[in-house]
Regions:
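Helix-to-beta-strand junctions that scaffold the AdoMet/dcAdoMet cofactor pocket
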Residues: 33, 104-105, 118-120
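A short SAM/SAH-binding and catalytic strip from SAM-dependent methyltransferases
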Residues: 94-106
Length: 240
């Protein structure tokens, strides 16, 4: 066990701290009925989100990265150009995107496509970073070359980890997400803000303690929830 991992185990034990992934998967389970037809947008290669969704229903994955074809949890994998999805109207009971919206260059097109492929009464569940957070601000301000250099290193990921994709952050505030849902004809979204463990503090104990202080502050009061990094959202397509 490394010193850095020891810090996470000491201050963020799994028995007392859920992080951001557990609440997101719970959101999906609470809103997606068993045996649903699920579209995972930005599915990528095999991952925990796809595995979780496959335990709920039949999952079709779509991504601009051909590596989606290597995702063993998908019943179907589709590579597309990132604009219009190659599915008929009302094809799915649920759509899910996990840390995808920050990479979407044209968010209103994305939300309208989600609304189109959802059946009436269907749900869209997503997780994405909040723009008003030091991680998102850094990713937005730094050139992508620096993001490639630093992002995985700061999170303590190995060389085998996938390089981060380019980011746009054009939909990553609560107000913008609410507006996009309305413009696409979706219901008023239910949004939750979370600040999980400081994963970008794995590179050095000094970073860890600094980011932990930030986590303790923004989780101390609802007043600071707009400064938390993780946005969880669920919205439905109105039933006919």
């Amino acid at each position: 066990m490394t010193i850095k991992q020891d810090l996470f185990d000491r201050y963020y034990p799994k028995s007392h701290f859920e992080g951001g992934t557990v609440p997101f998967f719970r959101l999906c389970r609470e809103n997606i009925s068993p045996q649903s037809r699920i579209l995972e947008i930005g599915a990528g290669p095999s991952n925990e989100c796809s595995r979780t969704l496959s335990g709920i229903g039949q999952v079709t994955g779509i991504d601009i990265d051909p590596d989606v074809r290597n995702n063993v949890f998908l019943s179907e994998a589709v590579v597309f150009e990132g604009r219009k999805m190659p599915f008929e109207d009302a094809s799915f009971d649920a759509c899910v995107s996990n840390f995808v919206l920050e990479h979407v260059e044209h968010p209103i097109e994305h939300f309208r496509e989600v609304a189109r492929v959802l059946r009436p009464g269907g749900v869209y569940c997503l997780r994405t970073p909040n723009l008003y957070h030091y991680v998102s601000m850094g990713a937005r301000l730094l050139p992508h070359s620096m993001h490639l250099l630093l992002a995985n290193r700061l999170r303590g990921l190995g060389e085998e980890a996938h390089d981060p994709y380019p980011t746009w952050f054009r939909s990553n505030t609560r107000s913008k997400l609410t507006t996009l849902c309305r413009m696409a004809g979706l219901d008023e979204p239910r949004i939750t803000m979370l600040e999980p463990e400081p994963s970008y503090g794995r590179a050095h104990p000094i970073l860890f303690y600094g980011f932990m202080a930030y986590e303790r502050l923004v989780n101390s009061s609802k007043i600071f929830e707009g400064m938390r990094i993780t946005v969880l959202l669920a919205t439905h397509k109105p039933a006919v």
